[in-house]
């Protein structure tokens, strides 16, 4: 959990994370203790020609560009009428991974059974209904307990969350604290802080949701979080080995397909897509499975623990990965001992200039007890 005066892991715009001490008031400056940056911009990926890796060399024999895909296993058919707001995702086999990020390599074959998936991210209206019915209080709304944070000054044990707070001038991209602030009173009811509200934003994705919050909602709704493999299979919509959920062109025919950041990150958003932050769900075209915002808008929780070497371990098993549930434990070399879950889909802060993990196969990561104003979720249901 992120608190003023404590070290924290924050999800940044491109789905990467950095470690810093949140010990200043919003708007102040502090140097991060360590930082991670993107390994490759999406512009380089777009410039890649067929038959090349991200580095520009020939495809390896274990990469999809040189292989004809094996026949798909017979996809399952929809078992009856769709639950309200859900779409049927047919089971099948696909290529999972991406060239652009080391933790999304190598490409590997995965099979998932069919399942139902929410067409859209869970909205403020839906989450409010749950909160009223159950009295549930999210992690961001709870006052931290001193025994859970020994050594923290009492004045810093204040409920709140992390909010994107862009500077009014260009800044170097190696100090992410320049555009993130811990805001007392920020939570799903007050996305930008205590003076903000969700009135009139019922159809926007609920944010500032920690993993526990999402799981509790899922149990109430009779659903569950998707696995990372299920999310990516659904995200691709049957378009195997494509760069985006809709194909290989970022703006096919000049059409904007997802809510991402345009302009100069982080200080100047030209809002070419019409939204400076999260957009109402369903504001952009659905994918081939009828799912909205599977790329951009807000990051989404999955049930998998995060390990950057997980894909390699699947490949070394030498068999098709069937319904993978993720690794048994979490490990991030940049933060040994800090458990993290996988995020998928990217957000409204993803940008060509800075990072681009809204591409199909991109991965994010985050501590289970931490939410931000660009992190939400959607749910799935097993066939019955």
Write out the residue ranges for each language-model feature.
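Short, compositionally biased
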Residues: 1-195, 212, 342-346, 367, ...
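Functional-site microenvironments in short loops/helix caps that host divalent-cation chemistry
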Residues: 58, 62, 88-89, 95, ...
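Active-site beta-strand/loop architecture of penicillin-binding DD-peptidases
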Residues: 374
